[in-house]
Regions:
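Conserved beta-strand hairpin/beta-sheet module of binuclear metal-dependent hydrolase folds
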Residues: 1-42, 126-144
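Active-site neighborhood of phospho(di)ester-bond hydrolases with catalytic His/Asp-centered motifs
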Residues: 26-29, 49-57, 77-80, 140-144, ...
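Active-site metal-binding motif and surrounding structural segment of the metallo-beta-lactamase
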Residues: 33-78
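Active-site environment of divalent metal-dependent phosphoester hydrolases
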Residues: 59-62, 84-85, 124-125, 147-150, ...
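Metallo-beta-lactamase
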Residues: 80-129, 133-136
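Hydrophobic, well-structured mid-protein blocks that either form specific transmembrane helices
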Residues: 117-162
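Cap/insert and terminal regions of metallo-dependent hydrolase folds
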Residues: 150-189
């Protein structure tokens, strides 16, 4: 198995996981050029992708859906609310026959990888984390979450690899165009 964190943070997120029979990208928040360059360093080529899983609709996770989908035959796995939010941007630019709607706590089998979306807490339409089972390993991807539900603690403790992505920049928050009530909630203890 090969796992490559291509980017993590407010400027863009993307994680690549490859097994013997599957090549999957989780989020596409960085440019096509950057994705291609970083994968090529490991002799991985974008046109080999089988699937793209999207955690939620924010641009640091979705900004480059269209160019990446254009360069692959990959299926796009996304929840309905995030897709609906993105529809004005991606309408007529993605073949909807390649879109698979996903729900929390359901298993999705892609060749030799099982992906189970889990519910997270974030200011988005419907954020999902991912529990992945591949090659006798358990991998968790938990990004942009304020709270992890207690019901997931035991599952996350069983992960061989757990990606937790979070950042908290007070100045960036205060300078943002978010509503004051939201800023206060985020800054609260």
């Amino acid at each position: 198995m090969q796992i490559i964190v291509l980017a993590s943070g407010s400027k863009g997120n993307a994680i690549y996981i490859e097994t013997e029979n599957s090549k999957v990208l989780f989020d596409v928040g960085i440019s096509l050029k950057t994705i291609k360059e970083r994968l090529a360093r490991q002799n991985v080529f974008l046109n080999q992708l089988d699937a793209i899983f999207i955690s939620h609709e924010h641009t640091d996770h979705t900004k480059y859906i269209i160019p990446v989908m254009d360069k692959t035959n990959a299926k796009l796995f996304i929840n309905q609310l995030s897709f609906d939010y993105l529809t004005p941007i991606i309408r007529d630019k993605i073949d909807t026959r390649r879109v698979c709607f996903i729900d929390k706590e359901r298993k999705y089998l892609l060749n030799d990888i099982v992906v189970i979306p889990i519910e997270l807490s974030h200011d988005s339409k419907n954020i999902l984390g991912f529990l992945i089972k591949a090659e006798n390993k358990n991998i968790g991807i938990v990004t942009d979450t304020g709270i992890v539900e207690k019901r997931y603690f035991s599952l996350l403790q069983k992960m061989h690899i757990l990606f937790l992505e979070s950042n908290h920049d007070v100045n960036m928050l205060l300078d943002s165009n978010r509503p004051w009530a939201l800023k206060q909630r985020i800054l609260s203890p």
